[in-house]
Amino acid sequence: ELSYLFLRAQALLLLPQPNLSLRIFRDSPQELLEAASRVIGLGSGMPQIFNDEAVIPALTAHGISDHDARNYAIVGCVELTTHGNALGWSDAAMFNLVKALELTLSGGIDLLTGRPLGSDLGNLTTYETYAELEAAFAAQIDTFCDKMAACIAVVEQMHAKLLPTPFLSAVIDDCMEKGLDVTRGGAHYNLTGVQAIQVANVADSLAAIRQLVYEEKTVSAERLLHALRTNFEDNPLLRAMLLHKVPKYGNDVAWVDEIGAKWVNYFASRLERYRNGRGGIYQMGLYTVSAHVPMGQNVGASA
């Protein structure tokens, strides 16, 4: 009954905050799913839907006990956590995937400033195959992941030194027993959450490059790279071709969606190599809306 009351309240108020979430599984009542769908259709974007059959195995794969995983909750907007026993450090960083791709295509040059920013591994005109481009993209991601992890380590150290949280520590399991503040590893679970941003843009860009440059060879690498460097100022027809003639992520085109999934999985596997200063692991999240405007402001033209 409470679930339906929450849905009714959201339908009446249509507030953007606090975020309302709905956990579902294969035996969720059809009536509940339909009620949630009607409320989502009112335009507030809520309730957010969380699939237990995807979330619970993902949590246990990261060392969360089955009991705690089944009792998961959502912190902040969409980040997953457990009840009363974790410091997940959600939003420790946001990683601009499409910026890493831009630097891969441009030889490490920031298209907005013209200054060196990333690793010079070649550029679009020097990668003879799509596989070479992918290898360079992976290497660019690796470089910035290392830089990001180093920065996060400093931030976490300074939080522990300058901003301990004794009240929070008093209500998080294991902190009292360990005699440690939650910022120093007192919690039962100590995670660091990093959000990957602009997966759809990466999939769309790589799909366009793969199809037009490497497979069909209807667009030369030189022409496309020039268009990216000049923001398509003298290439409106090429921009139209990229927008309308190449399949896009999220439209049930398997090979395009697989590009997005591939780089999500790669980024997640890359994060698994790191450990935070509290003895815990890194885990990945995905943001699909909130960070796209500020992230997009820091990216040049994309394919």
Predicted regions and their residues:
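Conserved catalytic cores of very large enzyme subunits
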Residues: 1-303
